[in-house]
Amino acid sequence: MSFSFFRKAPKFWERRGPTSLLLWPLSWIYGLVLHARKLIQDTGFVKPKPAPVPIIIVGNIRVGGTGKTPIVIALAERLQQLGWNPGIISRGYGGKGSSAQTSPLQVKSNSDPTLVGDEPVLIARRTHDQFPIWVFPKRQQSIRELLKHSPNVNVIISDDGLQHSGLARWPAREGGRDIELVVRDERGEGNRFLLPAGPLREPATRERDATLFTGKIKSDDHQIGLQDEYFLGRRAFSLLSNLGKPYQLNNPANTQTLTQIADSYLPNKITTVAALGNPQRFFDDLLKNGIAGKTISLPDHATYTPEFFTKLNAQCILITEKDAVKCSAIMDECIWVVPMSLALSDNLAEWLQSILQRPDPYRYTL
């Protein structure tokens, strides 16, 4: 059951009503399948071989984007500052080659996003190819290839993969040194139903080592306080993102501030386009910075053509960096790319460090 069944997240995912209740029996069946898979995994009949280095899994239980990619970038950069040599693996969502792919592919900043996916190329570009990045649906194979070509890597960050049973892990909460991070945005768990009646891949109470909050927090969410350090009995950390200085798509050296854009163009001459799992967050962030105008949300991983932008008839078109990797061949001077950065708190970095420094638990088991 896939999010791709819906072009966009349906409204009934946010609040329980007739449609979600009508679909609930399918969600119940989906839940049974999840439970059966977990039982098989727990019995050990199918046991993947663990990686020789710690794994940090950055995922979500809600389908669609919750802001994982900026977190992966921030994690890799912060871990490097702490003296680690991180590598990154991903399934390669959005890449047309993933289904026909027979072996892992290494991703560089000049890789074709239609083959390896939008996010991996974005990560490579933002980090200037500092970290080895490999993509393949079977993440265990990606790990083997990554370590084969980059034996100095001593920690691996998995962009998504919480639900990937083939990715062996010994979670920190159970005494291991692998870390499962659940990213949660302002939408929370919606109506808290599993697919397709709700937006959840797994139950809302799924175990995790920590929860990372992104975006604004709803004032009526009694489970979260501004000073809370725990969520569902585990550590929780709030991450704040900032929009950077937009740069021209066909001339990245040409930049201007969001304030300059707001002062230079009338709102009816500005169009913002986003193909994200949660585009409204991008639109809201721009509005906070004084950027009003028309907004267009497209399905996650949508592709673009020059004709699409021409038909917008806008003097200024704003897009995300994720969308920009798919627009390399488009030479429209009206398009400006808005970068987004995210910094990890010292508390989060220290907590990660304390777990990653644990001895390999597999060395002490029979």
UniProtKB/Swiss-Prot annotation:
The keyword Kinase applies. ATP binds at R62, V63, G64, G65, T66, G67, K68, T69. It comes from the Bacteria. SUPFAM superfamilies: P-loop containing nucleoside triphosphate hydrolases (SSF52540). It is an enzyme of class 2 (transferase). Transfers the gamma-phosphate of ATP to the 4'-position of a tetraacyldisaccharide 1-phosphate intermediate (termed DS-1-P) to form tetraacyldisaccharide 1,4'-bis-phosphate (lipid IVA). This is Tetraacyldisaccharide 4'-kinase. The lineage of its organism: Bacteria, Pseudomonadati, Pseudomonadota, Betaproteobacteria, Burkholderiales.
